[in-house]
UniProtKB/Swiss-Prot annotation:
Residues 346-410 form the S4 RNA-binding domain. Keywords: Aminoacyl-tRNA synthetase, ATP-binding, Cytoplasm, Ligase, Nucleotide-binding, Protein biosynthesis, RNA-binding. The lineage of its organism: Bacteria, Bacillati, Cyanobacteriota, Cyanophyceae, Synechococcales. One of its GO terms (molecular function) is RNA binding. This is Tyrosine--tRNA ligase. It comes from Synechococcus sp. (strain JA-2-3B'a(2-13)). Catalyzes the attachment of tyrosine to tRNA(Tyr) in a two-step reaction: tyrosine is first activated by ATP to form Tyr-AMP and then transferred to the acceptor end of tRNA(Tyr). The gene is tyrS. A motif ('KMSKS' region) lies at residues 242-246.
Amino acid sequence: MSISSASVSPAYRDPLIAQIVERGVAEIFPGGAAALAERLAQADRPLRVKLGIDPTRPDLHLGHSVVLRKLRQFQDAGHVAILLIGDFTALVGDPTGQSEARPRLTPAEVEENARTYLEQAGKILDFETPGRLEVRRNSEWLAHLTLSELIELQAQMTVGQMLAKEDFAQRYQAGTPVYLHEFLYPLLQGYDSVALAADVELGGTDQRFNLLTGRDLQIWKGQAPQFCLTVPLLEGLDGYQKMSKSKNNYVGLTEDPLTMYSKLEKVPDHLVERYFELLTSVPLAELPQDPRQRQILLAKTLVAQFHSPAAAEEAQRTAQALVLDGILAETGSIPTFAIDGLSYPVKLSYILRECGLCKSAAEARRQIQGGAVRLDGQKVEDPDLEFAHASELAGRILQVGKKAFRRLVKGAD
């Protein structure tokens, strides 16, 4: 069943519009799916669709990709995606969902995180088609607000309204400090919509208060208020908590194909259809009936999206080859060995010694000649096998015997 139960008038059954307003949508306001569908159908210009991201972490996971995919759908329908880097608001810290104030980042940390965010967002958004994407930073306008302008902005909301925000209310009632600068965050995010003249703003369900603040400030400034579209928060691999790197229940967008595949083929049964709806374009009516086949299709589909179909096929073959004695070798629990510090070209026998799978290069050669060494489940037969670049090894599983493994990685994993 679709997450959104919204019904769209047959007059607006353009498949691109239907996908935008129906699939993977939690709420659209004001007016619901039909109102936004009508606005999209009757638009005489590309709409400006805003998504703000605060670069508080250096990497993205599948949970972040849900709203990025929704932004891409607007691009595919001919509208302008505005990817707003909250380099100024990141210095404040979004209090949403926080039981205490966020640690404040340095400008250098924010800029480095923004750089990696953009690299990873390029896996989903259209960065190539002219006129389909604007990348902006809210320091362009927020850093230049005068004190009088800031006071005028703060005068648009009361303390009572701020304390109605669930996160603030819970902390206030619990006696946990709520700092004045945190009250600024919803106002600054809302002011971004004014500065960008946004027609639509996207966000997770936890951003509802901030999105509505944007509408209020646009009305205050005499602009047409934006539509707000929220998407569900994706549960992590544990099956219940929001996907988060801190909870170790995530799938990173930059993970190698085998790691990504191995995690996704074990998504809990009750979440598989939800993952398909939020993370893919596969018609839900066409999903296999067999639960195991659904998991496999999900894993292959997402690896193909973020890597390639060939990488997905290879990851599936490798994962199957790593089934030993009926027990799947969990890639997340396999010790890692960093390969980017090696001098290339490098022999596999040297790697076997350095990573601790063999005590010496001579032992490594004997293990290879005895047929005990496998790379991604395939038996290695050449004791002099060597590799010219780290890219040939990254993400692969090195195995000696039945139970000794190393996952080869670039840098710290």
